[in-house]
Amino acid sequence: ETVSVPDEDQREKFLGFHKILEKLFPLVHEHLQKTEIDGNLIFYWKGKSSDKPLVLMGHQDVVAAEGEWLHEPFSGDIEDRKVWGRGSADTKCSVMSFLQAVEELLKEGYVPEQDVYLTSSCTEEVGGNGCPKIVSELKRRGVKPYIVCDEGGAIVQEPIGGVKGYYAMIGVLEKGQGNLLISARSNGGHSSYPPKNSPIARLAAFVNDIEKHSPMKASFEKETEAMFSTLAPYGPFVYRLLFGNLRLFKPLLVKILPMISPQAGALLKTTVAYTMQSGSDGRNVLPQKATLNLNLRYIPHQGMKESNDAIRRIASKYDLEVEEIGCYDYCEPVDIHSSAYAQVEQVVNEVFPDLPVCPYVMTGGTDARFYQEICDACIRFSPVVYGPAQMKGMHGLNEYLDTYSLPGAVDFYRTMIIRNH
């Protein structure tokens, strides 16, 4: 059990997991240089050259497992050709697969052409400082990775509605995110004589303003355009018509996509979600302070500052205060025409020859963002199959991974190491 909890020292819990890794991967621990930083791991495999270091990464920590499960959430049961348990899909599958890949290569006496780093943080799920500690150590050593490969994209079933089959979705752009705490104040009072423009009424008007006149601009990033263009030939006729002719239909799609699909709309603009609210403690008491939390996911063409400023302008109309909490901007996109991206695409084609490869825009967050300062090609791709059941179970009930996914994942990481020369 490696559930991470914010602001708690849980190093001992993760050291227990590390002892299991020592038993499972003895050659890795014998031949690679291991560094442990507060439960976070770095394994260094010296290659013949240090010119193009490769980082394979995945987090050890998982979210809590609540509710009634078909199998105990930390049992690791293997049944019905599935590995059951919290973390099986998110993302111990990646950690175990790249460790197994290196274990096999060591057994064969293989020496990598380039340096290899296997890294794993223990605070990803709580947005902690585990990965920054790893990156800080790599910076201290002067390591500048050629490619970083983290979670994010995967082998996805039906990536957008109507496009059937499986696709290797390679994450190349990660949206930023942040929270804005909106506060409305008053003198409070009794609910029997409510004034106009009470705190909750002002918050309601504020939300209504955003919903009716959204300040967030929809537009196609070049990575989003590449994603839809790549998937177009595999969709029904209307997809091939619209997405195969984006230059012609882009103005129309910018308007209709957010209305048709929230998922597609999130690829085109900064999104605003209302997640938490508070008022008074009494049913008949007007609050002296009411709050509303907005969770934003920032798109490059309207980044963190511009998006937050747009919200501030609307908030000022209703005499509301705005506090930024944990905001960070979008990640610099990976150049899909770069040699690094081409190398990953080549490996996917070699290991999974029947899978179309497609760039992917990520609306969620990963640890890979911390590597931006030392690497230009932070790829988000887990080489396992994620269908609807995996997507539903990752932070929910009955998380599992199909066992048939694992040999391909190991082969992918083996090939990533071998082809990096």
What name fits each language-model region?
Residues T2-R86, K107-Q114:
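Acidic/His- and Gly-rich active-site-bordering loop/insert found
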Residues H29, K34-D38, I42-Y44, S49-D51, ...:
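An extended, acidic, His-containing surface patch that forms the Zn2+-binding/catalytic region
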Residues Q60-D61, I210-P215, R312-L320:
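A common structural junction motif
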Residues H71, E113, V143-K144, G165, ...:
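Short, solvent-exposed loop/turn segments at the edges of secondary structure
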Residues V83, A89-M169:
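Acidic/histidine-rich catalytic neighborhood of metal-dependent amide-processing enzymes
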Residues C131-E137, S192-M216:
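A short core secondary-structure module
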Residues A184, L296-Y298:
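Hydrophobic beta-strand positions in extracellular immunoglobulin-like domains
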Residues N197, S307-A315:
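Short amphipathic alpha-helices in soluble, non-transmembrane regions
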